[in-house]
Swiss-Prot record:
Active site per database record: 331
Enzyme Commission number(s) of this protein: 3.4.24.-
GO biological process per UniProt: killing of cells of another organism; proteolysis
Needed co-factor(s): Zn(2+)
Subcellular location field: Secreted
Residues the entry annotates as binding Zn(2+): 330, 334
Modification after translation, per record: PrtV is expressed as an inactive, multidomain, 102 kDa pre-pro-metalloprotease. To form a catalytically active protease, PrtV is first secreted, and then it undergoes N- and C-terminal cleavages during envelope translocation to yield a 81 kDa pro-metalloprotease. Outside the cell, the 81 kDa pro-metalloprotease undergoes an auto-cleavage. The two major products of autoproteolysis (37 kDa and 18 kDa) together form the so called 55 kDa active complex.
Gene name linked to the record: prtV
Binding positions (Ca(2+)): 757, 782, 821, 825
Protein name as catalogued: Pre-pro-metalloprotease PrtV
Activity control summary: Calcium plays an important structural role, providing stability to this protein in the cytoplasm. Outside the cell, the decrease of the calcium concentration triggers the autoproteolysis.
Length: 918
């Protein structure tokens, strides 16, 4: 594993994005300004000016879908090392049993951490920063001039920055200080304006292949080259972190020769907000890296052994000239390791996060979009607490089981109040998730999944003498290509087979090995002829690094074939012959963490933006109160259009009444549905929005809901993309009181024990010969069925939900199914079936003799599993004869065709034609 750690991972950053696939840059859909994008599409003729609001939205969705389909997004914006860091933090979170204070990359907990950010401003020959041709049509963040001092205040001021109409808006520094309880801050400098060598469209123009920006990274490199010659910047001030621990000493707070946090501002509106005068040729705001370290020639760092003692840059974020704090703080959140929380593929009408988090739509909150970004989700604050340390959350952790013994009453303060309890985590029993079904039988061998694994299974194997010996098995694998490897070993050395590769781009020394994806179960074979006549150690191992934990390796039905004769080694059924060190037997499912995070939201501090959300030129609000987040780690995305009601993160909507547009009858998007997701004692504020073509959205159900119970349906059947499917464990959360200003609420958490309703076992069977196919129609009205046990009446059993099986003998059999629910209650259903061997077709044949034109024919037909019960002859003149033999006079000499049809005692028919020559 040291080889992986020091060689493979050290090269990961420099090479991860070097292939042609990543010549373009990603898009961040979390910073989309839909209204401005629609205006751009109208302005450029892609949408008719008189199009209806519905048609405009459809056109916008198509525009975004094209970018998603052709380009790349989501975690593609993170390099290998950044993903590894995130994985380490998540591992710490999963292991916490209480208000644990582990910090992975933090300073001493008593210190306030201030990170250094360097902002570079760069314009274009055809679009200077002081002559950018912007108008109110392009942006609400319109200034006469965009001086460097504006960005200095926007990012680093402790007093805010001046808005276009003289307002005082929150700076990025103030946002992070508020969210962290003043335990984390940023400082830095805005340098420039520099000037690019080419016109703006060269950098932001979209690739024909991906429809994403072609040369945005080239613009970043040009800005860095000019930075290297700028005498006003002391680069050593911006190298105080070793973000990826390049020297492996565990110290993340030391120089590494790389600029810590780099922000680029270009002289146009971003494409995500219409692109200003450039339209689609503007750069789309994003977080990314430069593919390989870019060295700032002529500079001198404090790390002489790296980059020839010069500074370099790698990670960056890029924002538009008119950026507000929301976009900057969102992209900087990525730089701290946070993923996007929205539906990164736009699969449906929106995920149930929306404006509730800056890492979704909350970056665009405010009367002027982006000037009042909303707070982080509880999940994001939990992540930052464990990665940075400080006071992002002041939380209590409870388990569902301890609530059964004693209910708890908690005063939960608004999420912006970090000095008092502002989050409650409720852990649940592990969630059982359907996985990879075995290739055959009930079990297969599984490597398990995870970071930094060194898993193995082994056993002695005696290989008989022979000329050709082959190990054969079924394999299913999904392994991070070029980074993680599974291997077959003989006496500790890896051997090659038909599913292995010799590709080893990072010189790990682990090949031949299995890497990449099999796309289903495949037949594997490995030549063991060199060890014929010997007893060897057969082993499988699975070696992974950090960052991206893919499914791993499954192995089933291992056989040894010597000179054509096969013997079973192990099929994972019964007691295994393998010794396990990390590998396990797997029955086609795995377990995942899931839990609730309780957060109190208000319209105070950074959450003022929840009261000022602009849609269709009108303001709406997200309601204050108790927000219940449900985290489900069995999912890695929020693609709710593909799995409605399910995803890795979302809020439980307290108001299950769907909002519908009056004119079209269309169910509104999730951003409108979850406006009232909070549980509260106070009725909701009214909502009424009217579009330009008179379509009205009005919320007619404003009654408060103060109680959550996990036995209720929160899947939002009318608007399923906004719903959350939760599991019933008896969790009940009651809001007892809340302050008039919504600064806190008093919450009672309990586990309610109710009499379990037993499951109902039911099934249907389809019999074909000796084979039987089952359809399981069992149900559990108040929970989930967690196990199935079939008895086929012949000594065979199965734990699959809907198995298919075969009998070896005909006869009557009683098939029994026993189902057990998540509370331990069971039910049994039995059905008797009759099976028979498949009927063999009768074999038709005949002989004949003739005397002149007199012909006698007789059937010699047989039936191997019965008897012939009907014989029919069709003569040349069309007449029909029946019986095993007949005599008839044929009309002429020559060649004649006689058709013989025979039927057996089970109705099978065979017909042949007999040639008669007279």
């Amino acid at each position: 594993m040291k080889t992986i750690k020091k060689t493979l991972l050290a090269a990961a950053i420099a090479s991860f994005f070097s292939s042609g696939l990543y010549a373009q840059t990603p898009i961040d859909l979390g910073v989309v300004n839909e209204d401005k994008l629609i205006e751009m599409l109208v302005r450029t003729g892609q949408i008719p000016a008189d199009a209806s609001d519905v048609d405009k939205r459809i056109a916008l969705e198509r525009y975004l879908e094209e970018k998603i389909r052709s380009g790349f997004k989501g975690d593609a914006q993170f390099g290998k090392k950044a993903l590894e860091q995130r994985a380490k933090i998540l591992k710490v979170i999963d292991k916490q049993k209480g208000p644990h204070k582990a910090r992975v990359f933090a300073l001493d907990v008593g210190q306030k951490r201030t990170d250094k950010v360097l902002a570079l401003l760069i314009d274009f020959p055809d679009l200077p920063w002081d002559d950018n041709r912007l108008t109110k049509e392009h942006t609400e963040m319109l200034y006469d001039r965009y001086e460097p001092s504006h960005y200095q205040d926007l990012l680093f001021s402790d007093k805010g920055y001046t808005g276009p109409n003289g307002e005082n808006f929150i700076s990025m520094r103030q946002y992070y200080e508020s969210e962290s309880g003043n335990s984390y801050s940023v400082s830095g400098q805005a340098a420039g304006w520099y000037r690019a060598s080419k016109n703006a469209a060269y950098y932001g123009g979209n690739s024909p292949g991906t429809n994403n920006d072609m040369n945005a990274r080239e613009l970043v490199r040009e800005a860095l080259d000019q930075l290297a010659r700028d005498p006003n910047i002391n680069l050593a001030d911006y190298d105080i972190e070793d973000r990826y621990d390049y020297n492996g000493n565990g110290n993340f707070r030391e120089p590494d020769g790389v600029i810590d946090h780099l922000m680029i501002f270009h002289a146009s509106v971003g494409e995500e907000a219409g692109g200003g005068v450039l339209g689609a040729d503007a750069i789309w705001s994003h977080r990314f890296n430069l593919g390989r370290y870019h060295v700032l020639e002529g500079t001198k760092s404090n790390v002489p052994g790296r980059f020839n003692g010069q500074f370099a840059a790698f990670d960056y974020t890029i924002q538009p000239i008119d950026a507000a704090a929301g976009v900057c703080a969102h992209e900087y959140g990525h730089d701290l390791g946070l993923p996007d929380e929205y539906d990164t593929q736009y699969t449906g009408t929106g995920e149930p996060v929306s404006y509730w988090s800056i890492m979704s739509s909350g970056s665009w909150a405010g009367k002027i979009g982006g000037t009042q970004p909303t707070a982080f989700s509880s999940w994001a604050k939990q992540f930052l607490q464990n990665s940075i340390g400080g006071r992002w959350i002041n939380h209590e952790q409870l388990s569902i089981n301890e609530l059964e013994a004693k209910p708890r009453v908690v005063t939960l303060f608004q999420t912006t109040d970090n000095s008092r309890p502002n989050m409650v985590k409720v852990t649940l029993p592990m969630k059982r998730v359907e996985g990879i079904k075995p290739a055959e039988g009930e079990f297969s061998f599984y490597s398990n999944r995870g970071d930094d694994l060194k898993n193995r299974m082994s056993r002695p194997l005696t290989i008989p003498a022979g000329s050709q010996a082959t190990l054969r098995f079924k394999a299913w694998f999904q392994i991070e290509k070029d980074y993680d490897y599974a291997r077959v070993l003989i006496n500790g050395k890896p051997i090659a087979g038909n599913i292995t590769t010799m590709d080893d781009p990072f010189k790990s020394g682990l090949v031949p090995a299995i890497s990449g994806q099999s796309d289903g179960w495949v037949d594997a074979q490995f030549d063991l002829s060199a060890w014929a006549g010997q007893t060897v150690e057969l082993a499988f191992d699975y070696l992974t690094d950090g960052g991206l934990a893919m499914e791993g390796l499954y192995v089933d039905d291992l056989r040894l074939e010597v000179d054509g004769n096969q013997t079973l080694i192990d099929n994972a059924e019964g007691t295994s012959s393998f010794a396990f060190q990390g590998f396990t037997k797997n029955g086609g499912f795995h377990e995942a963490n899931h839990y609730y995070l309780l957060q109190w939201r208000s319209h105070n501090d950074v959450d003022q933006g929840l009261a000022n959300l602009k849609r269709f030129g009108q303001l709406m609000s997200f309601e204050p109160g108790l927000l219940v987040w449900y985290v489900d780690e069995s999912y890695a995305d929020n693609w709710v259009g593909k799995h409605p009601g399910e995803g890795w993160l979302g809020v439980v909507d307290a108001d299950q009444n769907a909002l519908v547009w009056s004119k079209t009858g269309e169910v509104a998007q999730t951003r409108f549905q979850v406006r009232d997701a909070t549980f509260s004692l106070f009725d909701q504020a009214p909502l009424k929005l009217v579009t330009a073509d008179g379509n009205t959205l009005e919320d007619m159900n404003l009654t408060a809901n103060a109680s959550f119970s996990d036995d209720q349906d929160y899947s939002s059947p009318q608007a399923p993309d906004s719903g959350r499917k939760v599991m019933p464990f008896g969790l009940k959360i009651d809001l007892l009181s809340q302050s008039k200003e919504n600064e806190y609420g008093v919450v009672r958490l309990s586990k309610v024990t109710t009499e379990n309703i037993a499951p109902v076992a039911r099934f249907e069977l389809k019999v074909e010969g000796l084979s039987v196919m089952s359809q399981n129609t069992s149900s559990d009205s108040d929970g989930n069925i967690v196990s199935y046990l079939w008895d086929f009446g012949n000594g065979q059993t199965s734990t699959e939900a809907a198995p298919t099986w075969s009998y070896t003998k005909a006869g009557s059999y009683s098939v029994t199914l026993t189902v057990t629910d998540d509370k331990g209650d069971s039910d049994t259903h039995q059905q008797t079936i009759k099976v028979d061997t498949p009927n063999a077709l009768p074999q038709a044949s005949a002989n004949y003799i003739h005397l002149g034109r007199w012909v006698t024919m007789w059937s010699t037909s047989t039936d191997s599993d019965g008897r012939i019960v009907d014989t029919e002859w069709t003569l040349p003149n069309g007449k029909i004869k029946r019986g095993r033999m007949f005599t008839a006079i044929f009309p002429s000499y020559g060649h004649h065709d006689v058709q013989l049809k025979v039927m057996d005692d089970r109705g099978a028919v065979t017909t042949i034609t007999i040639k008669v020559k007279l």
